[in-house]
Amino acid sequence: VKASKESVTGLYKRREDRPERPKKRGLIPFFIPHLGCPQICSFCNQHRIAKEEALDSRTSQELPSSLPSAQDVKATIEEYIGSGRTDKFWEVAFYGGSFSAIPRAWQEAVLAPAYEALLEGKIDGIRCSTRPDALALEDIDFLLEYGVTTVEIGVQSMDNQILQMANRGHNRQDVIDAVGRLKEKGMTIGLQIMPGLAGETWTSLVETAVAIKDLQPDFVRIYPVLVIENTDLADAYRAGDYQALTLDQAVAYGAFLKDYWEAAGIEVIRTGLQATRELDQGRGLVAGPYHPSFGELVENKRWRDRIQSLMDDVLAHLLVNQQNGLGYPLQNGLEEPLEIHVSYPLTMSSQIKGLKSANAVYFESTYPNFNWSWKGDGTRVTIRVGKLIFVL
């Protein structure tokens, strides 16, 4: 089943005509192994797991056993959505394996049943992930013919030297060109970034952040590099040629990137890999900043930084007024310590106070002469310092 050019390619002639991303989403994921990747990236172990099928079967027109059959796709969709539709925006997602780089016959085999479900109203969208150098105009048109309207690109970095060291096989300009072509077709664009690759510096990370901001994708995912067993990066790590990010470094990088991109109107939909039983148990993980609640740690850091910035301003205010003889007390040597009340929606408790109250512990120990209270009793985040009230 194919869509007409008018029904799909012309869905949204201008990107601003697209409806807003729905808040409630339901993804129906299918993982495509290392079938379309022409490169063996330094951080990826799929080539050693998939072995000959991944590397040799691209010349075959037979559907490899690692791809879902049409019946598998149909059954999985039914399993997710159940007997009746909900208010969720259901989207089939083909992840991994550089989807648009696998043979067209294979793409068609898995896209056709998904597109049929789209036409029947069972699902609301189809997306895939791929490489920037596998998105020529003909590749994009083919995806559109089968109802794909969201494409996620594995960018990883916008520094050519870092991309070369990671053996990505594409460069910065490939990313810029691919995003431009997708925008011409009115598609929704997601970019995946991997802080912590070999050769990265703070300067190169900031330059990547600026380059991504200039591209104005619809959303971004942030995946700090993990050193996985059976990868070139693991070999380099054991040889002392690569140093993995610490958890604190990765959290700080994630907080910076999320703050920067969200300020530019770019949605960051994920920070950190999805927790799995294997990663939680440390199986296959050699080194790197893995945490099952990494995204929550990033939010903790962002709120800690905001509160810290406020405290810096408050202390400066108290100091100036004391120097001007207005009698405002400083933090130290208070006869009656200032009360600091942090109020927030109850649903934001773990973000504001931090996991295991880490933020509360930090501020109470850093400013012991203030009386701190933390309560999930507000409709927004406010901080009352004495008689002063600040809205964050």
Per-segment meaning from a language model:
Residues I49-K74, G96-V251:
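Conserved non-cysteine loop/helix-boundary elements of the Radical SAM core domain that shape
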Residues S7-K51, K74, E78-S100, S129-R131, ...:
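N-terminal pre-triad scaffold of radical SAM enzymes
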Residues Q46, E78, G82, E184, ...:
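Generic secondary-structure signature for well-ordered alpha-helical cores
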Residues Q39-C41, I228-A234, L279-Q281:
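Short acidic/His/Gly/Ser-rich catalytic and metal-binding motifs that mark active-site loops
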Residues P33-C37, Y223-I228, Q274:
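Short glycine-enriched loops at secondary-structure junctions
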Residues A75-S83, P113-A117, F142, R181, ...:
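A generic secondary-structure signal
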Residues K2-G26, Y242-L392:
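Auxiliary Fe-S-binding modules of radical SAM enzymes
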Residues R25-L27, D87-E91, I123-G125, V148, ...:
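A general structural motif
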